[in-house]
Amino acid sequence: GDTQDDSLYIQVLGFNEDGTKVCAVYYRVFSGDTAQGDVWREYSEFVTNYRAKTEDGRTLPISLCLLDAGGHRQNHVLTLTLANPRIRAVRGRFYATEGKRHETALVDRVSSANALIGSTRVKCMLVYCGTICAKDLIYTRLRRLLYSENPQQESTWFPSTPMCGHDDGYYKGLMSNRRVDV
């Protein structure tokens, strides 16, 4: 998920058993002032209560939600991870700015960060993600999907109905990023 001053975002993904295929199941924007509690409560309830229905009729909950804690409302994100065990804070790392030339891992490391609850500091889990590695993986899979003669056989696919939140605006935003080599 992503955090902005005026909204929270969630992209629900479904994976096959060995993790080699992923499907974008549902996308939603939670509008509201993220300095206030209502939008966070709504987000947490969605993560807890959402169920995806499989083709064979099973219902699956969200087992893990990664929410960006690298900018907007970091303390709110960290506090939410304490309240909802399905939500984890994640922060992107861009290694070219840190003296390293190449990333090789999607998940770089797991660390901790302090959340301030009232006047008490509490340690929270924080997952660091290699942003270049993640974007390369996503855009390689998207490129294969776009040019595939049989999209359902690819490792990544999206529903064809905008009812799942994947409307034209979603795809324009997804494809607005461009790779720049540093």
Regions flagged by a language model, labelled:
Residues G1-D5:
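Two-metal-ion RNase H-like nuclease active-site motif
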Residues G19-V182:
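Mg2+-dependent endonuclease catalytic cores in nucleic-acid-processing enzymes, primarily RNase H-like
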Residues G14-N16:
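Residue-level signal for short segments within beta-strands and strand-turn junctions
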Residues Y9-Q11:
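Structural motif
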